[in-house]
């Protein structure tokens, strides 16, 4: 690739990065247009070209991040991290890029090749469809005046991404500005996102993703009450437990020693809850990455009485700390970056922030007050399976179109964020 083409290619990756990372199941107040199934198929086809490699990368993230501290809540977005890493890789020197690609296998190469091969008009068509689907929360690119202005114009040409020109030498003012900007974008869900900035920073990529689970069928708010959650043998906390009885996908694995239920949400997403047997959390934690797929394949549609705590969890981590954990090094050094700049100092900062919130909310605005809404047509002789999440469990938010994990979470103690 010629040096002159780099800004265009990178800007296209940033477009996709911002859009793919901006997935939210929160009900939108307005919708510019309805997305047709054909549009979703085209988006899915774009992602399927690197599906096998993405899954391997996501599994590596799962094993590394979830297992490293088994007694701590953890949440991250593998799709968000992988797309952002693909973005960063296109601005790296060959040696560093090879290190990143070794971890992601050919996934990054595929993404780069796709972007260079597709006509801009075709890309823009998909981009606009994605904007209409997920426009509420977007990645922001924050850099300073040393960045080549043609590079910035190319980004602005293809999408109105949020670009803030900031002097990173004024660290305190810059941190405050970034934190306020992101907080305003995601309804104050992120606090103190940026805690450290190097004065020599050239570009800061803030990668945030917020999921508010709007369920197809809400929980009954009048049944929510305080109950015990058994963190471990010595620790019991009181949490708000939600309840509902309905037919849903249910699975039981004696191999994994765990039970799974799947709850549909709006916007083609589902929440998958996996409950390890009592005393088997550590066993399930070690086996989950490899055996979860089998658990989902052997499922049944059954009447379930579900009891689960309200969930609000978040994690923020600098890529500088996150990536070495999965074997990607030297990505943020002054020797790594080759982006077209007007200065000589080139330090890159990138932050990942994931937030998930699941409450009683459903698609029907007044569903909790509608008695007919709660009538479940079942055989009176049928006894529901009781699944009570009163001990540590796993949570996955899955895209029903691509079957990708938008979020992966380990809920060890619902009382701590």
Swiss-Prot record:
Q: Which residue positions hold the site described Reactive bond?
A: 378-379
The residues that carry sugar chains are 132, 222, 268, 340
UniProt xrefs under Pfam families: Serpin
| PROSITE patterns assigned to the protein according to its UniProt record, in alphabetical order | SERPIN
Q: Which GO terms describe its biological process?
A: female pregnancy
MF GO annotations? serine-type endopeptidase inhibitor activity
Q: InterPro entries from the xrefs?
A: Serpin_CS, Serpin_dom, Serpin_fam, Serpin_sf, Serpin_sf_1, Serpin_sf_2
Indicate the secretion signal residues: 1-25
Q: Which residues are annotated as pro-peptide in the record?
A: 26-40
Q: Which UniProt keywords apply?
A: Glycoprotein, Pregnancy, Protease inhibitor, Secreted, Serine protease inhibitor, Signal
**GO cellular component terms given for this protein:** extracellular space
PTM comment: A series of at least four post-translational proteolytic processing steps and differential N-linked glycosylation generate various molecular forms. Three mature forms starting at positions 41, 45 and 100 are produced. Glycosylated; contains the so-called mannose 6-phosphate lysosomal recognition marker.
Q: How is this protein induced?
A: By progesterone.
Asked if the keyword Mitochondrion belongs to this entry, the reply reads no
Q: Where in the cell is it found?
A: Secreted, Extracellular space
Q: What is its main location?
A: secreted
Further information: The UFAP are a group of three (MW 42 kDa, 48 kDa, and 50 kDa) antigenically related, basic glycoproteins secreted by the porcine uterus.
Annotated family? Belongs to the serpin family. UTMP subfamily.
Q: How does it assemble?
A: Heterodimer with the iron-binding acid phosphatase, UF.
Give the protein name, as stated in the record.
Answer: Uteroferrin-associated protein
The source organism is Sus scrofa
């Amino acid at each position: 690739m010629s040096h002159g083409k780099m800004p265009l290619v990178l800007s296209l990756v940033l477009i996709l990065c911002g859009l793919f990372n901006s997935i939210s199941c929160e009900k939108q107040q307005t919708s510019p247009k309805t997305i047709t199934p054909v549009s979703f198929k085209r988006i899915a086809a774009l992602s399927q070209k690197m599906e096998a490699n993405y899954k391997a990368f996501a599994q590596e993230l799962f094993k590394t991040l979830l297992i490293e501290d088994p007694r701590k809540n953890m949440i991250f977005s593998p799709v968000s991290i992988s797309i952002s890493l693909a973005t960063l890789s296109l601005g790296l020197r060959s040696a560093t890029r090879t290190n990143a690609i070794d971890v992601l296998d050919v996934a990054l190469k595929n993404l780069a090749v796709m972007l260079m091969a597709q006509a801009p008009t075709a890309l823009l068509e998909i981009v606009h469809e994605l904007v209409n689907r997920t426009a509420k929360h977007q990645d922001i690119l924050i850099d300073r005046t040393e960045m080549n202005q043609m590079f910035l114009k190319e980004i602005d040409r293809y999408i109105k991404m949020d670009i803030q020109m900031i002097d990173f030498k004024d660290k305190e003012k810059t941190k405050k500005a970034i934190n306020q900007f992101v907080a305003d974008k995601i309804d104050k869900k992120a606090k103190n996102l940026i805690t450290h900035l190097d004065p020599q920073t050239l570009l800061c990529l803030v990668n945030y993703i917020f999921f508010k689970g709007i369920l197809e069928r809400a929980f009954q708010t009048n049944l929510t009450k305080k109950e015990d959650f058994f963190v471990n043998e010595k620790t019991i906390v009181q949490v708000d437990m939600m309840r509902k009885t309905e037919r849903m996908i249910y699975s039981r694995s004696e191999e994994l020693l765990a039970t799974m239920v799947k709850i549909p949400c709006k916007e083609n997403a589902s929440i998958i809850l996996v409950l390890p047997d009592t005393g088997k959390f550590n066993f399930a934690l070690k086996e989950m990455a490899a055996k979860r797929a089998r658990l989902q394949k052997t499922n049944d549609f059954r009447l379930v009485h579900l009891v689960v705590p309200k969930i609000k969890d978040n994690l923020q981590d600098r890529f500088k700390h996150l990536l070495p954990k999965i074997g990607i090094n030297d990505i943020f050094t002054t020797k790594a970056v080759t982006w077209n700049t007007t200065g000589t100092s080139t330090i890159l900062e990138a932050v990942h922030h994931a937030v998930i919130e699941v409450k009683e909310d459903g698609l029907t605005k007044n569903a909790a007050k509608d008695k007919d809404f709660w009538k479940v047509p079942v055989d009176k002789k049928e006894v529901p399976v009781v699944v009570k999440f009163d001990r540590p469990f796993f949570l996955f938010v899955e895209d029903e179109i691509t079957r990708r994990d938008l979020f992966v979470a380990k809920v060890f103690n619902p009382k701590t964020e």
